[in-house]
Amino acid sequence: MAFESLTERLQGVFKNLRGKRKLSEKDVQEVTKEIRLALLEADVALPVVKEFIKRVRKRAVGHEVIDTLDPSQQIIKIVNEELTAVLGSETAEIEKSSKIPTIIMMVGLQGAGKTTFAGKLANKLVKEENARPLMIAADIYRPAAIDQLKTLGQQINVPVFDMGTEHSAVEIVSQGLAQAKENRNDYVLIDTAGRLQIDEKLMTELRDIKALANPNEILLVVDSMIGQEAANVAREFNQQLEVTGVILTKIDGDTRGGAALSVRQITGKPIKFTGTGEKITDIETFHPDRMSSRILGMGDLLTLIEKASQDYDEQKSAELAEKMRENSFDFNDFIEQLDQVQNMGSMEDILKMIPGMANNPALANVKVDEGEIARKRAIVSSMTPEERENPDLLTPSRRRRIASGSGNTFVNVNKFIKDFNQAKKMMQGVMSGDMNKVMKQMGINPNNMPKNMDSSALEGMMGQGGMPDMSELSGTNMDVSQMFGGGLKGKVGEFAMKQSMKKMAKRMKKAKKRKK
């Protein structure tokens, strides 16, 4: 994920400040020097770095830091605020037309991800606004781009207008807009041609399309993996076309992230969306304050909550909770839950959105094996509908058939079913509030719990029967996390369990005091 090295460097800088009661001007100079080096290593453009450091230093050498009793927190606060300002301060929405359709023109270099982004944005508009977009394939130089856009359109059930490669891009856009008005589409997304580098022919064509379409938005799609060159590309396109916003693609890649910090400052135009993966749903509205928080390792709970809420169905959740309580959770429910977890993104990225988890050493032990998840899916897919609904039907002969059909060994199938049954029992205990049962399932003897810990009161920690934090179940005899292809292992898992027990003991003390 982008920014990982920058986050690590900045956290190291802030760590060195801890314990200091006050900072001298010399200390501030040293801190800002380290921040400057960290930004340059992250491929942030030099002019942006200079301006950023100048602003941080100006605030830090004043009364804001030198006279404060907690300089490390104050420095972090200043850096966070200035970083947010560099990224744009406020979230920028799509500029909509007062009359339909709203026309959005995608521009950028070849390979930046314009076509893919057009599909992602169209899907987002359909899902969130119940919109009726039309996509126009205006890249006449790459037949593959037209085919790709049509494939994406079929995937998300959005119409694509194309006239092949025999007509000019301007003619195609003209005909496409006429069709959009006739069909009363509320959005038109124009996928334009790109080049491996900026040239006058490309710009002339784009200017002609702009003059014809009069778009509400001209979104520059930038590949975040090209580093400092992103700033030059953004500057040139903005000078020629006056873009209205920027899209950063491939931000999930192993990049240094400097593009995000450079583009906004150099063009003066807001970053509106980021591409966070290969799936059609891997698109996020860009929030400067949240991105700043992520870069500084402070997490991003709001985005995490939004991701979790996208496919949330209150009725289904209530039904699932009841099935857990009644111990009738089946393999169909398991696959449904697996889909929901995977739709949120990789487990590593989800954990990094939790405050304090970015670059946490424990994350090095969290490994989600996609192959393992695929094997579990294959096992369930090889079951009959009756077997999925009633796991008790799985006799040894049926398990051998499932192993053969799914390409797994008999041992692996047995282990999967055993883990599933143990997880069911544990979930039933959690939902019913029987914590003694839960601890036994986890391999913990309730009699060995700390004396100041009343297990009957543990259900108060669960939010009145809610599910516990599954990360606190790691390092136990029953590794429920393995059901989803990964988890904390070894000494780290054991340490996490002990820390969890200590936290629960403290919370029990507080709960008892409140009752008194």
Curated annotation (Swiss-Prot):
E.C. number(s) listed in UniProt: 3.6.5.4
Region (Disordered): 383-405
Pfam family, one: SRP_SPB
SMART domains the record matches: AAA, SRP54, SRP54_N
Major localization class: cytoplasm
Any one Gene Ontology cellular component term annotated for this protein: signal recognition particle
An example Gene Ontology biological process: SRP-dependent cotranslational protein targeting to membrane
Keyword annotations of the record: Cytoplasm, GTP-binding, Hydrolase, Nucleotide-binding, Ribonucleoprotein, RNA-binding, Signal recognition particle
Compartments (UniProt record): Cytoplasm
Binding site for GTP: 108-115, 191-195, 249-252
Keyword Disulfide bond: no
GO molecular function: 7S RNA binding; ATP hydrolysis activity; GTP binding; GTPase activity
Enzyme class: hydrolase
Domain of life: Bacteria
Reaction catalysis annotation: GTP + H2O = GDP + phosphate + H(+)
Phenotype on disruption: Doubling time increases for growth under nonstress conditions, unable to initiate growth at pH 5.0 and under 3.5% NaCl salt stress. Double deletions of Ffh and FtsY, Ffh and scRNA, or Ffh and YidC2 are barely able to grow in the absence of stress.
CDD domains: SRP_G
Family: Belongs to the GTP-binding SRP family. SRP54 subfamily.
Subunit relationships: Part of the signal recognition particle protein translocation system, which is composed of SRP and FtsY.
Domain statement: Composed of three domains: the N-terminal N domain, which is responsible for interactions with the ribosome, the central G domain, which binds GTP, and the C-terminal M domain, which binds the RNA and the signal sequence of the RNC.
HAMAP family: SRP54 (MF_00306)
Function: Involved in targeting and insertion of nascent membrane proteins into the cytoplasmic membrane. Binds to the hydrophobic signal sequence of the ribosome-nascent chain (RNC) as it emerges from the ribosomes. The SRP-RNC complex is then targeted to the cytoplasmic membrane where it interacts with the SRP receptor FtsY.
Protein name: Signal recognition particle protein
Species for this entry: Streptococcus mutans serotype c (strain ATCC 700610 / UA159)
